[in-house]
């Protein structure tokens, strides 16, 4: 079995494949790829349990592909600066490709472009379409936001005020989910009060919710856009003895989120398929580096469908997701 390296730091999904290159026409083939062996890296944007599932996908691809070795990294502080340090280190180690989830796509464009001159660069989870990345693998986040907006309307048929929570609004996936929610709520009797950010600080994520419950005692709904926001919202609502009185819509499948759905404390969660992010990113990078680009559409965006988890299907989903987590 090929060696699979996990370095526990924090980041979003980035896939870069390739080797050193001397022109702007894209990555050239290095010694290892010319010999048929590829070293691929997957870089996340934080250390959420979400990425544990993505890692299982990369491991499956790693085990299936005899000519591929995968290195998995999580940036501890979830910053663009740490992502750059990781990418520089991976380049120094001679990887052929990197799949990354850019924390701040707009301000990381130059870093991604410089990297793409040397190796194959792929984005996952959060896209950077203005960069020279080869393609994106992940959720259609505008569509996912529309789904979340529809769930908010279901949970609040009489309307009301809602607050949204997310780590960073610089991330494209956050921006697009917010866009989708706003589109879905347009013309409804639901008012978005604001979007509170926490810079991926879990303590701050919860305090943002607690502060909202005090400042806006009539708030009817709370929406978490990133995976850890769901548990943070749930914990703050429980502490305030407002379980059931305030409707919660979340994203992703952290344990406490699924438990909250099962208990009826969370109305629903929109789950992505991070296993497929990892699995497809590695397989497609290999295929791309081997010269076969047929799997990449003209849009350069490979969308993985989302699922809606409510009380009636949470048990079955939890069983399946725990299998992916190796539990």
Question: Where in this protein do the model-derived segments appear?
Answer:
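Hydrophobic alpha-helical
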Residues: 99-115, 181, 199-260
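Short, low-complexity disordered leader/linker segments with a strong preference
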Residues: 1-39, 113-120, 327
């Amino acid at each position: 079995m090929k060696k699979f390296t996990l370095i526990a730091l924090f980041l979003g999904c980035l896939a870069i494949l390739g080797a050193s290159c001397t022109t702007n026409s894209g990555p050239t083939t290095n010694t290892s790829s010319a010999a048929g062996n590829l070293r691929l890296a997957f870089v996340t944007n934080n250390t959420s349990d979400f990425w544990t599932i993505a890692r299982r996908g990369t491991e499956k691809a790693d085990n299936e592909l005899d000519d591929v070795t995968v290195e998995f990294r999580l940036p501890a502080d979830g910053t663009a600066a740490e992502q750059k340090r990781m990418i520089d280190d991976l380049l120094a180690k001679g990887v052929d490709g990197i799949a990354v989830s850019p924390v701040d796509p707009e301000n990381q464009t130059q870093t991604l472009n410089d990297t793409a001159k040397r190796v194959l660069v792929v984005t996952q989870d959060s896209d950077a379409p203005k960069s020279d990345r080869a393609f994106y693998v992940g959720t259609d986040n505008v569509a996912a936001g529309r789904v979340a907006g529809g769930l908010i309307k279901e949970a609040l048929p009489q309307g009301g005020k809602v607050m949204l929570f997310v780590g960073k609004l610089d991330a494209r996936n956050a921006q697009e989910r917010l866009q989708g929610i706003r589109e879905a709520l347009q013309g409804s009797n639901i008012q978005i009060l604001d979007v509170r950010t926490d810079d991926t600080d879990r303590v701050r994520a919860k305090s943002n919710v607690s502060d909202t419950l005090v400042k806006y005692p009539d708030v009817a709904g709370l929406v978490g856009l990133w995976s850890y926001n769901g548990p943070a919202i749930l914990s703050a609502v429980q502490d305030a003895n407002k379980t059931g009185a305030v409707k919660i819509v979340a994203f992703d499948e952290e344990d406490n989120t699924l438990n909250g759905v099962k208990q009826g404390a969370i109305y629903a969660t929109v789950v992505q398929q991070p296993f497929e992010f990892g699995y497809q990113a590695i397989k497609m990078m290999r295929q791309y580096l081997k010269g076969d680009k047929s799997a990449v559409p003209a849009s350069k965006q490979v969308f993985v469908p989302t699922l809606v988890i409510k009380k009636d299907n949470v048990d079955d989903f939890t069983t399946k997701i725990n299998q992916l987590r190796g539990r």
